[in-house]
């Protein structure tokens, strides 16, 4: 095993402060960094010796022999489940990285329904209230090509359900709903059996479109409530918890295990084919290159390596370490060459940032001459990440396409969701605009359909009584 690099910022908030120094011996589960503000504890994921403590990371030289045992977390009251979650350093494992101990620190039984925005909830009465409070389990595995969440349901459904029940207990929620795409038949059947005797836990089936895993999309699909870009799920008396996060909660409470490993998918231009390689319980801090080698190694010349998913991931390097929020490592085919042609960028809250899209345009040898923003992309405050007004439901992109045409674009690169991409295609090609999606090189690599015209229904039949 190569040196393990454990970043000091693996969560929403400020970087943690190291509490170890070079030369210190550490074990799996040794606490090595603590929050300086909003954040979560960080632990060693291996047995070894601290080589360096840098400004942004702790470098550990692993021992040749790695034991399975770990140092258990300790709290004043072992019956305090929320304290165990906080001490374990658990964050949103789906990519957001918000500290779970803070997210679960709410009493949903005493949380009132917020006032809804009538403009985005025209079908609901002004005085609409939800009768129950909910834990919503995000099992959408939203990013195409990733498979580790579904694998965890198939192999560890009992652990996941235990974690969900702990979330309900901690927040005083009276119901829980699993949000999962209908296409995952095997996982759904396993989940149905796992919750058969759980009267307050049900399943909501999702269509296979992007971005069904966006937090507010999960609330909308499960509860029929549209939240504004400023509202949290608590406005709908709910907390959204990622599937893998729920499993980590069960580990913290049942085993006193700190958050030191990550499940992820390695896929793409890999020797042996483009099938998904799912790795469970990978030590946090292992390098991207080491995992690619475990999957078979890169097959020849490639375009880029992405950490995360095709939509929201970022280009990375072989020596970059994985974190608590890493979901995918994608090795792509080479980019097409646009030979300096004029390019327009359509930036969407559901996809990459403008910076990421400019990077893609540069790798395609395109000249960016126009940048438009999806009209549903809202910037809540200057510099904040964009949020979609109604994730997955798009009113149209004709105005933006007309601007691209006016700016003499030959190509446009879009980062839109399934529905927005569909509306781009309704007018863009008719105006002579050639369309690329920012995910095209990934989709072609993994054999997934391109995001253009929407060919699947946004409505799916549900299980009887959610069971």
What are these regions (language model features)?
Residues 10-14, 26-29, 43-52:
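Generic structural motif
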Residues 342-389:
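Redox- and metal-dependent alpha/beta enzyme cores, enriched for Fe-S-associated oxidoreductases
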Residues 92, 135-149, 378-384:
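Gly-rich Lys/Arg/Thr-decorated short loops/hinges at beta-loop-alpha junctions or inter-strand turns
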Residues 26-40, 57-60:
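Short hydrophobic beta/alpha edge segments that flank linear recognition/processing sites
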Residues 1-18:
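Acidic, low-complexity mobile loops and tails
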Residues 114, 118, 174-288, 294-301, ...:
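Hydrophobic alpha-helical positions that pack around
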Residues 154-170, 359-361:
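Histidine-anchored nucleotide/phosphate-binding helix
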Residues 149-152, 183, 372-463:
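Cofactor-cradling patches in redox/metallo enzymes
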């Amino acid at each position: 095993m190569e040196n393990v690099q454990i970043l000091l910022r693996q969560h929403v908030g400020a970087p943690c402060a190291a509490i170890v120094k070079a030369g210190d011996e550490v074990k799996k589960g040794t606490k090595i960094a603590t929050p300086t503000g909003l954040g979560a504890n960080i632990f060693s994921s291996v047995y070894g010796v601290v080589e360096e403590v840098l400004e942004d990371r702790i470098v550990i030289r692993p021992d040749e022999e790695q034991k399975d045992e770990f140092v258990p977390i300790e709290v004043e009251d072992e019956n305090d489940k929320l304290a165990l979650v906080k001490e374990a350093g658990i964050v949103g494992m789906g990519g957001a990285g918000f500290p779970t101990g803070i997210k679960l620190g709410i009493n949903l039984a005493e949380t009132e329904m917020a006032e809804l925005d009538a403009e985005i909830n025209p079908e609901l009465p002004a005085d609409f209230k939800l009768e129950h409070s909910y834990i919503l389990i995000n099992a959408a595995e939203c990013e195409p090509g990733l498979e580790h969440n579904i694998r965890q349901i198939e192999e560890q459904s009992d652990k996941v359900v235990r974690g969900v029940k702990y979330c309900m207990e901690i927040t005083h929620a009276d119901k829980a709903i699993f949000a999962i795409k209908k296409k995952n038949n095997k996982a759904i059947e396993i989940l149905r059996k796992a919750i058969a005797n759980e009267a307050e836990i049900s399943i909501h089936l999702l269509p296979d479109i992007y971005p069904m895993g966006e937090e507010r999309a999960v609330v909308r699909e499960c509860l029929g409530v549209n939240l504004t870009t400023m509202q949290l799920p608590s406005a709908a008396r709910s907390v959204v918890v990622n599937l893998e996060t729920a499993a980590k909660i069960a580990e913290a409470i049942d085993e006193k295990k700190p958050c030191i490993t990550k499940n992820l998918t390695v896929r793409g231009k890999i020797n042996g084919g483009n099938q998904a390689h799912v790795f469970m319980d990978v030590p946090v801090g292992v390098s991207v290159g080491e995992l690619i080698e475990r999957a078979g190694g890169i097959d020849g010349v490639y375009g880029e390596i992405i950490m995360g998913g095709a939509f929201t991931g970022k280009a990375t390097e072989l020596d970059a370490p994985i974190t608590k929020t890493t979901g995918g490592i994608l090795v792509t085919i080479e980019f097409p060459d646009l030979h300096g042609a004029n390019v327009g960028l359509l930036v969407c809250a559901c996809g990459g940032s403008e910076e990421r899209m400019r990077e893609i345009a540069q790798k395609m040898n395109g000249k960016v001459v126009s940048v438009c923003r999806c009209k549903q992309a809202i910037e809540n405050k200057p510099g904040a990440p964009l949020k979609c007004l109604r994730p997955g439901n798009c009113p149209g992109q004709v105005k933006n396409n007309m601007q691209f045409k006016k700016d003499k674009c030959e190509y446009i690169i879009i980062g839109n969701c399934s529905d927005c991409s569909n509306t781009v295609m309704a007018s863009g090609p008719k105006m002579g605009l050639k369309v690329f999606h920012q995910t095209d090189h990934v989709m072609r690599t993994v054999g997934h359909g391109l995001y253009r015209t929407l060919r699947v229904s946004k409505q799916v039949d549900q299980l009887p009584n959610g069971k």
